[in-house]
Amino acid sequence: MTRSEVLFEQAKKTIPGGVNSPVRAFNGVGGSPLFIEKADGAYIFDADGKKYIDYVGSWGPMILGHNHPKIRQAVLDAVDNGLSFGAPTELEVKMAEKVISMVPSIEQVRMVSSGTEATMSAIRLARGFTNRDNILKFEGCYHGHADCLLVKAGSGALTLGQPSSPGIPEDFAKHTLTATYNDLDSVRAIFEQNPESIACIILEPVAGNMNCIPPVEGFLQGLRTICDEFGALLIIDEVMTGFRVSMSGAQGHYGVTPDLTTLGKVIGGGMPVGAFGGRKDVMQFIAPTGPVYQAGTLSGNPIAMSAGLAQMDALCEPGLYEALADKTKRVAEGFKAAADKHGIPLNITYVGGMFGFFFTEDNTPMTSFAQVTKCNMEHFRHFYHAMLDEGIYLAPSAYEAGFMSMAHGDAEIEYTLAAVDRIFAAMK
């Protein structure tokens, strides 16, 4: 047995399923997960000492690469001053100012400790501000594991939500309405049936939890129009896309202005963090200035703020996002070129520093959850393990996006595409 396999068996004795987040268990691809010992630049190293080019990047935060020297030094400097105070710090103010300077729709921002906390808090705030109970989300979009968000569409887009996890009372789920991503007609129909009860729409502007599905032209703007028409708030969940798709997030890239935005991942530089922010009149409705309660012992943790500020400062380097997008395009289009060369049905998507690939005969643009669920999962599993054997680490699920970092250079990209070519040649 490998050291990772031994550790996995050991972990299952004390940790449910042997992991602290389900996708890490490799249930989507089979086999035992890698246990990671360290990471540096574009590489991770497992417990057996094997090196892999990493396209997971801790699920998105490591946009500059692992163990970046400026971020590491910022953390070490902050540790010298103490780990946590449970009191305001100048670092929190600097982080808020940095976020607001980069995202025009955010006038005030509140720090929390996770993406789930951010979305949960933003929805509570939207409900309190509008005095409405219902929310609208999209099939295939993930916003953390809060009760009201673990809901699926049921038998159709207009079906009232049913819990998709035990432990969620139907009384909670009935207030979550589910529409079809990239389908404005489904959204308008739900609003017309519930014209005065929907507090907000929440969505991933690029759906990164059904692989990587960008919005079709006009979709985000159409949601803005519907929200304005019916008096609902628009919440754009940029926990994944924030500062990864562009310097001002996906909302800046696609030109849409939400009322509230949720953030995480990149703004922590690899440390646990989340945030939600938006219009000042809405944010003033949160305690202590307003009646909607939200609190957190570790919110604005100085270590996380230091790491995040170091990363955010580095992201302001001129040309960085253009270079990141070019790297992403090279990888995604390289996958497609190799697939076409060897007759492997494959579709691709990419935007900013995110990419997706789909083993499917469907060569039309990937725009929906329905298309994703029809992809060939066996081909994905085979490809996944073949890439591991080549020393390339991808997300262990066909429903997760790939992430590029600035640490991926020509050598890593060229090696990756050569490996893809070898694997596709053998799959014919």
From Swiss-Prot:
Gene Ontology CC: cytoplasm
Alphabetical list of PROSITE patterns matching this protein: AA_TRANSFER_CLASS_3
Cofactor names: pyridoxal 5'-phosphate
Pfam families: Aminotran_3 (PF00202)
PTM annotation (N6-(pyridoxal phosphate)lysine): residues: 265
UniProt superkingdom: Bacteria
Top-rank EC class of the record's enzyme: isomerase
Subcellular location: Cytoplasm
Catalysed reactions, as listed in the record: (S)-4-amino-5-oxopentanoate = 5-aminolevulinate
Transmembrane segments annotated in the record for this chain: none
One record GO biological process: protoporphyrinogen IX biosynthetic process
Gene3D superfamilies attached to this UniProt entry: Aspartate Aminotransferase, domain 1, Type I PLP-dependent aspartate aminotransferase-like (Major domain)
GO MF annotation list: glutamate-1-semialdehyde 2,1-aminomutase activity; pyridoxal phosphate binding; transaminase activity
EC number, as in UniProt: 5.4.3.8
Listed pathway(s): Porphyrin-containing compound metabolism; protoporphyrin-IX biosynthesis; 5-aminolevulinate from L-glutamyl-tRNA(Glu): step 2/2
Family statement drawn from the similarity comment of this UniProt entry: Belongs to the class-III pyridoxal-phosphate-dependent aminotransferase family. HemL subfamily.
UniProt cross-references to HAMAP family, sorted A to Z: HemL_aminotrans_3 (MF_00375)
PANTHER family (alphabetical): GLUTAMATE-1-SEMIALDEHYDE 2,1-AMINOMUTASE, GLUTAMATE-1-SEMIALDEHYDE 2,1-AMINOMUTASE 1, CHLOROPLASTIC-RELATED
Protein known as: Glutamate-1-semialdehyde 2,1-aminomutase
Species: Shewanella frigidimarina (strain NCIMB 400)
Gene this chain is encoded by: hemL
